[in-house]
Design a protein with these regions (language model features):
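Loop-helix junctions at membrane interfaces
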Residues: 1-194
Length: 194
């Protein structure tokens, strides 16, 4: 009986965490003071933090927060190419969240964490580049800089860099927060001091 209450309480807590992360994911694109737009690329510092933290909690929470974050880009009035780029992040989010759920120790070792960031960042960059390519060849993206600069460098490599920065910020935020989160989560950081 007590276990059922605890389980229900955990579910409620996880629901509240998901809702708060969705709210953060929605509001960041709207109010972030650090937005750099080099169409079709946009760098909104912190726009992936809620999603990464949700990935640390569970795949379901990550998926919900990713969709909520996409809504934030719609509400912020970003153009369709940027909104669709936000939507295709679902691929790296689901893969990354399942990875962390199956291998929760991933972020506790430098090599496995670097591999995680690289693989999810590449998925992220490729998915966004594919969406942008569709708009590029459809004529709705300025082609004056050429495909390589516009799609490969700005979107592909730019997304990978943005992914890595937001991931690092997410881990720095998660480290103290995880100590007060008392529900089952996919990731607990156990960094050893030398």
């Amino acid at each position: 009986m007590n276990q059922t209450r605890t389980s229900a309480a955990d579910r409620l807590t996880i629901l509240v965490i998901a809702a708060l992360l969705c709210a953060i994911g929605i509001i960041v694109p709207i109010i972030s003071p650090i937005k750099i737009r080099l169409d079709p690329m946009s760098f909104t510092l912190g726009s992936h933090i809620a999603v990464f933290i949700a990935m640390f909690v569970s795949p379901v929470v990550a998926l919900c927060v990713e969709l909520g974050t996409t809504l934030g880009f719609v509400l912020a009035g970003f153009p369709p190419v940027i909104v669709l780029r936000a939507l295709v992040q679902v691929f790296f989010v689901v893969v990354g969240a399942i990875w962390l759920q199956k291998k929760p120790e991933t972020l506790n070792r430098w090599v496995s964490m670097s591999l995680f960031v690289l693989v999810t960042g590449l998925l992220h960059g490729v998915a966004e580049a594919l969406v942008s390519t569709w708009f590029y060849f459809g004529g709705s993206i300025d082609q004056s800089k050429g495909f390589f600069v516009t799609i490969v460098l700005l979107v592909g490599v730019g997304t990978l860099a943005h992914h890595a920065v937001d991931f690092a910020l997410s881990v720095l935020i998660w480290k103290p927060v995880e100590k007060i989160v008392r529900v089952p989560v996919s990731v607990r950081l156990n960094w050893k001091k030398k």
